Curated annotation (Swiss-Prot):
Phosphorylated by ATG1. ATG1 phosphorylation is required for preautophagosome elongation. The keyword Zinc-finger does not apply. It catalyses: a 1,2-diacyl-sn-glycero-3-phosphocholine(in) = a 1,2-diacyl-sn-glycero-3-phosphocholine(out); a 1,2-diacyl-sn-glycero-3-phospho-L-serine(in) = a 1,2-diacyl-sn-glycero-3-phospho-L-serine(out); a 1,2-diacyl-sn-glycero-3-phosphoethanolamine(in) = a 1,2-diacyl-sn-glycero-3-phosphoethanolamine(out); a 1,2-diacyl-sn-glycero-3-phospho-(1D-myo-inositol-3-phosphate)(in) = a 1,2-diacyl-sn-glycero-3-phospho-(1D-myo-inositol-3-phosphate)(out). Residues 442-462, 630-650 dip into the membrane without crossing it. This is Autophagy-related protein 9. It comes from the Eukaryota. Residues 1-173, 769-876 are annotated as: Disordered.
């Protein structure tokens, strides 16, 4: 009845445009008043009504003069059923019934209400001319909070109200809503609801990335299940081999039943029984965690399948950059990341700032912890050296050591709510207390390492033996295979570089690292190896020849007591293969600098001490410490299980003060992102000229106090710039569907040039940029040693391209030019590599860098470069003719070359 009275008093929908504008202004003022007063509620029936100020004032005056103290329609059961979720309609009066501040009229205490205005619960309300359509979800009862009100405001802005469906199309049936507001019918609606209400973006983005790396729900469940079964098999098989076999009876027995120990479980030592109980509890806990993670994985599967449109069958082939672009397209559907929320609605959210979620922000969230570890290694704050007799100090940082450091340091730093950064580290007054607590954590982590070391050593040894024994027995040459150590990989990693991208870059460096170490000739060793291979091959060839003549007789012929010919054939063949592998190859060209240049290009690691010394044996020795045989890496892993307690209890506590100071001085608070490492914020708008002129990149000049301070905050080995250019190379795209270098989509390019008499990489023969990295990154693993030949050498452009994966504040500015970039391509033998090229007056000299090609994503940019080269192109000569011929082929012209 109250709504009918207002409908007669207020203007109708057929008023003129001026009255509609005034009504809209009044509605905005009413909405703002509702937001500013959290104790008010909303009468849903009057959502679509329009009010004039004088009408409301007259109505309030009439109500006060008649001594009316009616209750809101929200108090009725029908209104409570029609209220939106999260809105408490029983405790407060509607917003339109609140007295105006300028004309507040005190209400009388008389409770007499006219009979016509009474709304009894048992009486039927008057029929609504516009009945509520069927199929709408029933309200979910719950307390009214700021978060639920913000959700309702967002939903009201993005979806039409119930009253707007009059005479329209039938409303879609949302399906039943289960207890707690969870959708039970439509998985797409459930995935949308979960994304809209997601507030912990760090955890959610981590789950999204783990799902992508894990290749989908079924692959992740299968991998974890097989891992549990493998660990159970290893422990059970070790128990059987250790306690259920009588090894003293092996020599005189020919059946397994004769050597088995009956009721062997009673013979197991108490210490091993304790270990079995601990392992059983851990295994059951892991299995329970797998079962409880299935609903979460199912929800992530729906998110990929319905919102990102990426089914599990495509998740192994789609690029991460496409996943990022599709997540960015969903930002306006989330409360915390939406850009279309009003300031009044934003005030009701827990986070007053809009959460940032572009490519840089997603990488910063995923790498929030790893960025700090990369910076700790870059600044050389963690002292993980162990003095070894006759060998000096050696770096010992294996996966076991990294796990304990993460437990002692990173779990302490990120001990805030929901695993966030602990704000105590940002305050200098907490320094002494934090140092004391960090030393205590190092000590107790060392105690835990001592307790777990015996079990870990036995388990890892058995697992490694069961996994690799067959491979090493079949091919002994695999014992010499090398890999980068864990310490080296942390030195190579870049800021905001996701693990799967780093693994791809590391894999590209493997073939060149092997060829580099094989470049250093050892003349004496090679001569001896050739002689041994000759002798072993001679004996083996004679034995094989006699075997072919009379195999039945000669195979049982004993050359030495108890050793037949077949035994000696196997021994001599093994000796020959090992000696032959150490002999030099006839077609090998010795040029260590060439191969190490390619290793540096992919690893992006080049200390200052290596400058102009890539051919020396000292550099080879330093590189060999980073690239060691796998068998030595495994031995170091076993040794670290014994050495790690020493590091945790004696070495690392001495670094506690520097660690605490590091987290305070290299942490910044970013609005919409939280606390993050300062190195993860790239200089998109500041440019790189000032960074290149920083003290860390200057030499030979006297450094004052200001320069020393800048040097302290500067990353070593140009790590910051390398990370910046690497990130742009990974995520740079124009949004046209093609990335910087998508394989199979580029135009025709001529074949690579042949090496000339000056060497394969001389100044006239352009370098072959192997495994050049584009946005698509190509297939994982080791890349072929070829790419298209540039027309005039790759050249960096002055203006960077814009990327659809970056927000406007992250777009590279014109100041962020590529000259001076540390990411230059492998240079020639007679050319100084990796040197920035300065501009000369009247001439633009571009550095020889493969990053330049990755920034050229349009054919127009390449044509502009060709036009710039045209005026000074006529230099004559055979090389010029070949260049013109290659250019004609690249442009697709079938005509001849003009001479």
């Amino acid at each position: 009845m109250a709504s009918n009275l207002l409908s007669r008093l207020l203007p109708s929908a057929s008023d003129d445009l001026l009255e509609q504008e005034a009504s809209n202004n009044q509605n905005r003022r009413t909405s703002s008043s509702t937001d500013e007063r959290p104790d008010m509620d909303i009468d849903e029936e009057n959502f679509g009504a329009r009010f004039e100020a004088q009408d409301l004032n007259d109505l309030l005056a009439e109500a006060s003069s008649s001594h009316m103290t009616t209750e809101s329609r929200a108090a009725s059961p029908e209104a409570r059923r029609n209220a939106p979720p999260g809105i408490n309609t029983a405790a407060r009066a509607p917003a339109w019934r609140q007295p105006a501040p300028a004309r507040a009229v005190p209400l009388d205490d008389d409770d007499d209400v006219p009979q016509s205005l009474l709304l009894e619960g048992g009486l039927d309300p008057p029929p609504n001319p516009h009945p509520r359509p069927d199929g709408l979800p029933p309200p979910v009862p719950g307390p009214s909070t700021r978060h639920t009100r913000a959700q309702w405001e967002t939903t009201r802005q993005q979806q039409r109200l119930h009253g707007d469906d009059r005479g329209g199309a039938p409303v879609r049936d949302w399906g039943a809503i289960g207890r707690g507001g969870q959708f039970t019918a439509d998985p797409k609606e459930k995935a949308s609801w979960l994304w809209v209400n997601q507030t912990d973006l760090d955890t959610y983005m981590r789950e999204v990335y783990e799902y992508y790396v894990g290749s989908g729900i079924y692959s992740m469940i299968l991998r974890r299940t097989l891992s549990l079964l493998q660990s159970a098999f290893v422990v059970g098989f070790m128990t059987f081999l250790g306690w259920c076999i009588d090894y003293s009876k092996l020599s005189g027995s020919n059946k397994l039943s004769q050597v088995l120990v009956p009721k062997c479980t009673k013979e197991i030592h108490g210490f091993w029984i304790f270990a079995l109980w601990v392992f059983t509890i851990y295994w059951l806990y892991s299995f329970y965690g797998l079962l409880t993670d299935i609903p979460r994985l199912r929800a992530m599967h729906d998110f990929y399948h319905y919102l990102l449109d990426v089914p599990d069958r495509d998740i192994q082939t789609i690029q991460w950059q496409q996943i990022v672009s599709r997540i960015m397209a969903l930002r306006d559907l989330n409360l915390t990341t939406a850009s279309n929320l009003s300031p009044e609605t934003r005030k009701l959210l827990d986070s007053k700032s809009r959460q940032r979620l572009d490519a840089v922000d997603i990488a910063s969230r995923l790498m929030r912890r790893d960025n700090y570890l990369i910076a700790l290694f870059n600044k050389e704050i963690l002292d993980v050296t162990v003095p070894i007799p006759f060998l000096g100090n050696r770096f010992i940082f294996s996966e076991t050591t990294g796990w304990h450091v993460n437990l002692a340091v990173m779990e302490f730093v990120f001990s805030g709510p929901n695993g966030q950064f602990n704000q105590d580290f940002l305050k200098e007054r907490n320094r002494r207390e934090l140092v004391r607590r960090l030393r205590g954590r190092f000590f107790w982590t060392g105690i835990i390492s001592i307790i777990c070391a015996p079990f870990a050593v036995v388990f890892v040894l058995a697992s490694y033996l069961f996994k690799y024994f067959t491979e090493y027995h079949k091919d002994p040459g695999q014992l010499s295979n090398r890999d980068f150590t864990t310490f080296a990989q942390w030195k190579f990693r870049e800021f905001n570089e996701l693990p799967h991208l780093f693994n791809r870059r590391r894999n590209m460096a493997y073939p060149y690292a092997n060829l580099y170490l094989a470049q250093f000739p050892k003349d004496k060793t090679e001569q001896i190896s050739s002689f041994v291979a000759f002798i072993a091959g001679a004996f083996a060839s004679v034995l094989v020849a006699f075997t072919l003549l009379d195999s039945e007789l000669f195979l049982t012929f004993e050359i030495s007591p108890g050793k037949t010919a077949i035994f000696w054939i196997g021994v001599l063949t093994t000796i020959y293969r090992v000696a032959r592998g150490s002999s030099p190859q006839e077609d090998q060209v010795t040029d260590p600098s060439y191969y190490l240049d390619h290793v540096i290009y992919h690893t992006r690691y080049k200390p200052d001490s290596w400058q102009d010394r890539l051919h020396t044996d000292e550099v080879r020795a330093e590189f060999a410490k980073l690239y060691q045989p796998k068998i030595l890496i495994f031995a170091e892993e076993i040794l670290s299980m014994v050495v790690t307690p020493f590091l945790l209890m004696f070495r690392l506590p001495q670094c506690s003060e520097r660690i605490v100071d590091f987290f305070r001085e290299f942490s910044i608070v970013v609005d919409g992102l939280g606390v993050t490492c300062s190195y993860s914020m790239f200089p998109f708008k500041k440019g790189t000229q000032n960074v290149n002129n920083a003290p860390a990149n200057r030499s030979g000049a006297h450094k004052d106090d200001g320069d020393l301070r800048e040097d302290y905050f500067m990353a070593k080995d140009n790590k910051m710039l390398a990370s910046y250019y690497g990130f742009l190379d990974t995520y740079a795209t124009t949004g046209k569907g093609n990335s910087a270098r998508l394989p199979g989509r580029a135009g025709f390019h001529p074949p690579p040039q042949f090496p000339n008499a000056f060497g394969a990489m001389s100044q006239t023969a352009q370098p072959v940029d192997v495994g050049a990295r584009g946005t698509s990154r190509g297939p994982a693993g080791r890349q072929p040693l070829q790419r298209r030949t540039p027309r005039s050498g790759p050249a960096g452009r002055d203006e960077p391209i814009a990327s659809v994966l970056l927000d406007p504040h992250h777009q590279p500015s014109s100041a962020s030019i590529l000259r001076g970039s540390p990411r230059t391509g492998p240079s020639g033998r007679y050319r100084t590599p990796l040197q920035p090229v300065a501009d000369t007056p009247g001439t633009r000299i571009e550095e020889e860098s493969t990053i330049g090609d990755s920034w050229r994503t349009s054919r127009l940019a390449q044509d502009d470069d060709e036009e710039e080269e045209a005026p000074g192109a006529n230099r004559g000569g055979v090389l010029q003719l070949l260049q013109q011929f290659s250019k004609a082929q690249a442009e697709g012209r079938g005509a001849g070359v003009g001479v």
